[in-house]
């Protein structure tokens, strides 16, 4: 049953009605093969087809993958999150106006549409207790970042805090204390890029970029710390927690107007609770980190779609090796394995042996995966 907590505009109502009439609800069963995949890993993903945008579950085995079930959404999705009840959350890509809870097992949906002078920036996290959600947002009047504090059951906003920067993007709950920042603190990636509504996603005033990593008190929103990189053109985008090295890896995207400097810019920074430092010794990766995950055994993997490569780094942020993979972006890791998206198939990498790579071939129906994945259900 769909739940609408804010007024539905005619365009929203039209889309929901057309989606039902067109059969764009949950896609259950095995649409690609009748026989089951052997011991698959299931990923929560978002993707595009020629005529629709989707979120859904994808089963991945050693040599093939398939869509398990899916749900059409009104615009391109971005961040996804798996809840303890096996339901999932997805948000529209920035500047977005919808937040969705979907129950893949039953097909039940709960929609929340943001209104007024706010837009979603594509990411959400939950409190450890599961009663609160935090969403990164932008104030359309000022372009300043806001953190929406939401009731997890209703998805309604109960409070709002400043992120102390523009263009807040990813956020994470710090798993354990680092330096003077306590466990449970909210880490926010202020991308630092101004993009007001009249310009859509077009960027402006890049010479005044002010990207930062911010730690906030999860109870009050008070600032616990703020860090910046020396290169002001590096936009801070996405996070990964390395439980081995006890560090936070951050995927970067350069906005440097000088083409050569942009192409050679670092795609990773590492925060240890005290310092925020960029990667060292990396080759040219076109200055664009699409997604990031922790590397089993310690370190990080950063997808570099513009370089058609997966860049592997040590926990100290030193570049290690590149794995070629065309137009790769979405990453996810579980246990001793990690996976990466790409139009040629889903790449899976074995533990501690980064040259042991398997490519699960794409089915006949080609999908264009979006930016992020999660493992479903939660372990």
Language model segments and positions:
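N-terminal export signals
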Residues: 1-35
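Residue-level detector of Asp-centered blade-edge/turn motifs that repeat once per structural unit
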Residues: 83-85, 128-129, 175-182, 243-244, ...
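Repeated scaffold domains used in trafficking and secretory/extracellular systems
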Residues: 75-82, 119-125, 166-173, 234-239, ...
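Short, conserved, GDST-rich strand-edge loop motifs in beta-rich repeat architectures
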Residues: 136-139, 189-209, 251-264
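Beta-propeller blade signature
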Residues: 147-151, 206-218, 265-272
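Blade-loop segments of beta-propeller domains
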Residues: 71-83, 87-101, 107-126
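Asp-box/WD-like beta-propeller blade repeats and closely related beta-sheet repeat scaffolds
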Residues: 115-125, 136-175
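Surface loop/turn motifs at the tips and blade-to-blade linkers of beta-strand repeat domains
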Residues: 70-74, 113-116, 161-165, 227-232, ...
